UniProtKB/Swiss-Prot annotation:
<dbReference type="GO" id="GO:0071596">
    <property type="term" value="P:ubiquitin-dependent protein catabolic process via the N-end rule pathway"/>
</dbReference>
<dbReference type="GO" id="GO:0004057">
    <property type="term" value="F:arginyl-tRNA--protein transferase activity"/>
</dbReference>
<comment type="similarity">
    <text>Belongs to the R-transferase family. Bpt subfamily.</text>
</comment>
<dbReference type="Pfam" id="PF04376">
    <property type="entry name" value="ATE_N"/>
</dbReference>
<dbReference type="InterPro" id="IPR030700">
    <property type="entry name" value="N-end_Aminoacyl_Trfase"/>
</dbReference>
<comment type="function">
    <text>Functions in the N-end rule pathway of protein degradation where it conjugates Leu from its aminoacyl-tRNA to the N-termini of proteins containing an N-terminal aspartate or glutamate.</text>
</comment>
<dbReference type="InterPro" id="IPR017138">
    <property type="entry name" value="Asp_Glu_LeuTrfase"/>
</dbReference>
<dbReference type="InterPro" id="IPR007471">
    <property type="entry name" value="N-end_Aminoacyl_Trfase_N"/>
</dbReference>
<keyword id="KW-0808">Transferase</keyword>
<dbReference type="Pfam" id="PF04377">
    <property type="entry name" value="ATE_C"/>
</dbReference>
<dbReference type="GO" id="GO:0005737">
    <property type="term" value="C:cytoplasm"/>
</dbReference>
<dbReference type="GO" id="GO:0008914">
    <property type="term" value="F:leucyl-tRNA--protein transferase activity"/>
</dbReference>
<keyword id="KW-0963">Cytoplasm</keyword>
<dbReference type="InterPro" id="IPR007472">
    <property type="entry name" value="N-end_Aminoacyl_Trfase_C"/>
</dbReference>
<keyword id="KW-0012">Acyltransferase</keyword>
<protein>
    <recommendedName>
        <fullName>Aspartate/glutamate leucyltransferase</fullName>
        <ecNumber>2.3.2.29</ecNumber>
    </recommendedName>
</protein>
<dbReference type="InterPro" id="IPR016181">
    <property type="entry name" value="Acyl_CoA_acyltransferase"/>
</dbReference>
Amino acid sequence: MSKLKELPLSALQFYATAPYACSYLDGRMARSQVATPAHLINADVYSRLVRAGFRRSGIFTYRPYCDECHACTPCRVVVDQFVPDRSQRRAWSRHQHLQALVAPLTYVEEHYSLYLLYQSMRHAGGGMDQDSRDQYEQFLLQSRVNSRLVEFREPPGSPEAGRLRMVSMIDVLDDGLSSVYTFYDPLERNASYGTYNILWQIRQTRELGLPHLYLGYWIADSRKMAYKARFRPLQVLTGNHWHAFEDEAGDAASPAPASNRD
């Protein structure tokens, strides 16, 4: 990089939030480190921050900064070495007929309705099922980086042609894709939309000639986050270096069982 291009990153400031209730591990308090100002975090700077363990929520870029707990571990799939297991192959076979449309981040009422339904059935009591349209847009549709929205529908000619099944937000980085958030039809209890979505993103990353799919944070003791260990080979960020997941996780490296959460 030239010095001129490095300026936005060197001009960033980082602050720690006040403690708040952890949304992944009951009874624990969490803190985040937030990068500011947001207008300096362009696609190039954001790619470097993601490699350092940051994520984003809307225009806010953050990473875990807890006082004692270090359960949140950044993880990424090495896509050119990935081989799906049997359950993942079944998920791909079950849903590969879905028609994917990649678009800019755009508000669609049908997407918002599916989001509320998903939150009410998959994360009841978390409060996000009460999100207003403004909250939904701030969370998922505001971005200063290279972001895309992908919707998955039943294809023309099928019994439920055009039915919306899933919506996913992704960021395009200089070394991969970053999976931001996904919500899907929770009424299909035997579906594996979550697994299929990650498989689809792995394939897209590979087709773009990029090496990594960033999946956010792996948390061994959180069922909502431990499933990421099923996508191997996985790398995790510890001590400012990316390592093979198995080398760092020890006994916790045993993949979480598949469930209907996917």
